From Swiss-Prot:
It comes from Sus scrofa. This is Signal transducer and activator of transcription 1. Keywords: Acetylation, Activator, ADP-ribosylation, Coiled coil, Cytoplasm, DNA-binding, Host-virus interaction, Isopeptide bond, Methylation, Nucleus, Phosphoprotein, SH2 domain, Transcription, Transcription regulation, Ubl conjugation. The modification N6-methyllysine is found at K114, K175, K296, K366, K525, K637, K665. The gene is STAT1. The modification Phosphothreonine is found at T749. GO terms for biological process: blood circulation; cell surface receptor signaling pathway via JAK-STAT; cellular response to insulin stimulus; defense response; defense response to virus; metanephric mesenchymal cell differentiation; metanephric mesenchymal cell proliferation involved in metanephros development; negative regulation of angiogenesis. There is a cross-link at K703 (Glycyl lysine isopeptide (Lys-Gly) (interchain with G-Cter in SUMO2)). The lineage of its organism: Eukaryota, Metazoa, Chordata, Craniata, Vertebrata. Phosphorylated on tyrosine and serine residues in response to a variety of cytokines/growth hormones including IFN-alpha, IFN-gamma, PDGF and EGF. Activated KIT promotes phosphorylation on tyrosine residues and subsequent translocation to the nucleus. Upon EGF stimulation, phosphorylation on Tyr-701 (lacking in beta form) by JAK1, JAK2 or TYK2 promotes dimerization and subsequent translocation to the nucleus. Growth hormone (GH) activates STAT1 signaling only via JAK2. Tyrosine phosphorylated in response to constitutively activated FGFR1, FGFR2, FGFR3 and FGFR4. The modification Phosphotyrosine is found at Y701.
Length: 753
């Protein structure tokens, strides 16, 4: 079963997340047509190899040609047109940059897998998840309140109809009596008195009905106000907070469809109340009297209805998808000058009459006081199409939305040399995107405005890790969208908050977050051995100060390890093969009672660019004290040449003139090395190219292989039973194999990292 087919079986709230992955740069229809083929390609490799990416780009175009031919046989003109258009767009966008296409496809497939996993976890825990049950009960209660508003409006509609009928009857009888009074024959006094008494009775009924209708409208507006407060102050605020968490790697935010449904029902109800008030005015114009309840209350009812509708419509204007560069989909809110970014707006009040009637304009740093109060605060211009009309056709789910896809930022250069004397560094300087539009209807003009979460603007991709750290810190600690002076005096974070966010950084790009032991080790690095959930970590400790005795800060170390995992260790991390973050004391405690040759994998604490090493345990020949050995850590340089599973498989220790042996036997706690890593070992390569095709023997190149060898003194090895002495000829052969060229890739043991 293809991944694409599984996705199509999910509930609508997960399908909406799938919809948000695809846009014009790589349309969903290509994903649909070439589902199986796309899933069978190694896009991660293509995203890091321009030659391979170019091949895959042309393969994709060929696949589209084949699909076009199939549609031709079926005489499907529309699909032929779509295929041809998609192919043309791909050529325009990626002909010169096929790696970009591979990155987009690779990311889409990864995000799809995360959505599937989240859906599976949701389905597994839904029945027993108390929090979900509480939220479900809360939503049921709110759903009931919204339905109650709608029902009351319908009830008032019926009451106004009854009032209109009563008033028509009263008016008819009044006119009839007047006509009879002017009749030459006249009417008997007794009959006239009876009819006047009847009219008086009808007048009282009419007055009571008007009072009743006005009272019910007041009651409706009271109920609507309470319901609206729950929507705006509770549900919408919670959604925005969940969006902040999702932006920094937290659980995917629940879709807006349910919220939109509630907002729309309340808005439709208020629009209907406006029509009902107009009807009451018409009835008042036909007939009024002293102390008429309509005359007395109509202005207050109009004002309150308008105020509620205005508040609802203004609150419904939200940023559905925060600003993000397509090149870095997992790092939203960090924007680089000169690089396009996207952002999506949505109106939660989905009224048909608003389709194509709201023109949205985007502005940068509108009304931002920091432009004038913070020294050195940079200023930017927005390039690209910065106006867009909201419509229901562009969104795959039919919501009223506007998506800006081709915006860029350009810094305003001031005359003279720029000074860096401001209190904020570039990656601590927060900016804001504002969006404004105006709703115009007969007798109704409402200005709408919303803002993005704060963004960090960088000019060099090397600033991305520090910029992302600022985004993490802000959205972890702050719920308000416009506190752009935050880093003038950033608050501390509790370890309970930061530990969760750190785990999200791993779970958002892999299948595995950080466990309790790993987090404990990181907590000790930041807070010392007394680390606890309420321990406070300053911003400078997290991101700016060198950690302990190292020459780099904590966050840059974590970021480098994340990059190492994504590019070289993803499968091993997902399978749980890597212990990763573990102190030396804890490492020895785990290994000391294990059988000789047991090893574990951990990240180096001393390497700025991110590195991984392995430590194994041995025992003296008499079975006494355990001894521990750790190899010099492997960085991306070594792992780019040889995969880590192959390094583990072929690793050798050579002492004096003994035959090299692999000391690694069991992955902690007791998993056979080949069982743990066998599926990741490189497969045999194709036959080597002959050196002389026309030679008498047709001999080819002798196959070579890069292996890691640690040359150590025999005294460092406690178990030498398996290290057999070599003959001079054997030693010469091994020395030739591990020559100067290969030793570029050889790790010489220099002690623990």
């Amino acid at each position: 079963m293809s991944q694409w087919y599984e996705l199509q079986q999910l509930d609508s709230k997960f399908l909406e997340q799938v919809h948000q992955l695809y846009d014009d740069s790589f349309p969903m229809e290509i994903r649909q047509y070439l589902a199986q083929w796309l899933e069978n390609q190694d896009w991660e490799h293509a995203a890091n190899d321009v030659s391979f990416a170019t091949i895959r780009f042309h393969d994709l175009l060929s696949q589209l040609d084949d699909q076009y031919s199939r549609f031709s046989l079926e005489n499907n003109f529309l699909l032929q047109h779509n295929i041809r258009k998609s192919k043309r767009n791909l050529q325009d966008n990626f002909q010169e940059d096929p790696i970009q296409m591979s990155m987009i496809i690779c990311n889409c497939l990864k995000e799809e897998r995360k959505i599937l996993e989240n859906a599976q976890r949701f389905n597994q825990t839904q029945s027993g998840n108390i929090q979900s049950t509480v939220m479900l009960d809360k939503h049921k209660e709110l759903d009931s309140k919204v339905r109650n508003v709608k029902d009351k409006v319908m009830c008032i509609e019926h009451e106004i109809k009854t009032l209109e009928d009563l008033q028509d009857e009263y008016d008819f009888k009044c006119k009839t009596l007047q006509n009879r009074e002017h009749d030459t024959n006249g009417v008997a006094k007794n009959d006239q008195k009876q009819e006047q008494m009847l009219l008086q009775k009808m007048y009282l009924m009419l007055d009571n009905k008007r009072k009743e209708v006005v009272h019910k409208i007041i009651e409706l507006l009271n109920v609507t106000e309470l319901t609206q407060k729950a929507l705006i102050n509770d549900e919408l605020v919670e959604w925005k907070r969940r969006q902040q968490s999702a932006c920094i790697g937290g659980p995917p935010n629940a879709c807006l469809d349910q919220l939109q449904n509630w907002f729309t029902i309340v808005a439709e109800s208020l629009q209907q109340v406006r029509q009902q008030l107009k009807k009451l005015e018409e009835l008042e114009q036909k007939y009024t009297y002293e102390h008429d309840p309509i005359t007395k209350n109509k202005q207050a009812l109009w004002d309150r209805t308008f105020s509620l509708f205005q508040q609802l419509i203004q609150s419904s204007f939200v940023v559905e998808r925060q600003p993000c560069m397509p090149t870095h989909p997992q790092r939203p809110l960090v924007l680089k000058t000169g690089v396009q970014f996207t952002v999506k707006l949505r109106l939660l009040v989905k009224l048909q009459e608003l389709n194509y009637n709201l023109k949205v304009k985007v502005l940068f740093d509108k009304d931002v006081s920091e432009r004038n109060t913070v020294k050195g605060f940079r200023k930017f211009n927005i390039l690209g199409t910065h106006t867009k009309v909201m419509n229901m056709e562009e969104s795959t789910n039919g919501s009223l939305a506007a998506e800006f896809r081709h915006l860029q930022l350009k810094e305003q250069k001031n005359a003279g040399a720029r000074t860096n004397e401001g209190p904020l560094i570039v990656t601590e300087e927060l900016h804001s995107l504002s969006f404004e539009t105006q709703l115009c209807q007969p007798g109704l003009v409402i200005d709408l405005e919303t803002t993005s979460l704060p963004v960090v603007v960088i000019s060099n991709v090397s600033q991305l890790p520090s910029g992302w750290a600022s985004i993490l810190w802000y959205n972890m600690l702050v719920a308000e969208p416009r506190n752009l002076s935050f880093f003038l005096n950033p608050p501390c974070a509790r370890w309970s908050q930061l530990s969760e966010v750190l785990s999200w950084q791993f779970s958002s790009v892999t299948k595995r977050g950080l466990n309790v032991d790993q987090l404990n080790m990181l907590g000790e690095k930041l807070l010392g051995p007394t680390a606890g959930p309420d321990g406070l970590i300053p911003w400078t400790r997290f991101c700016k100060e060198n950690i302990n005795d190292k020459n780099f800060p904590f966050w840059l170390w974590i970021e480098s390890i994340l990059e190492l995992i994504k590019k070289h260790l993803l499968s091993l991390w997902n399978d749980g093969c890597i212990v990763g973050f573990i102190s030396k004391e804890r490492e020895r405690a785990l290994l000391k009672d294990q059988q000789p040759g047991t090893f574990l994998l951990r990240f180096s604490e001393s390497c700025r660019e991110g590195a991984i090493t392995f430590t194994w345990v041995e025992r003296s020949q008499n079975g006494g004290e355990p001894y521990f050995h750790a190899v010099e850590p492997y960085t991306k340089k070594e792992l780019s040449a040889v995969t880590f599973p192959d390094i583990i498989r072929n690793y050798k220790v050579m002492a004096a003139e003994n035959i090299p042996e692999n000391p690694l036997k069991y992955l902690y706690p007791n998993i056979d090395k080949d069982h743990a890593f066998g599926k990741y070992y490189s497969r045999p390569k194709e036959a080597p190219e002959p050196m002389e095709l026309d030679g008498p023997k047709g001999t080819g190149y002798i196959k070579t292989e890069l292996i890691s060898v640690s040359e150590v003194h025999p005294s460092r090895l406690q178990t030498t039973d398996n290290l057999l002495p070599m003959s001079p000829e054997e030693f010469d052969e091994v020395s030739r194999m591990v020559g100067p060229v290969e030793f570029d890739m050889v790790s010489m043991t220099r002690g623990r990292s």
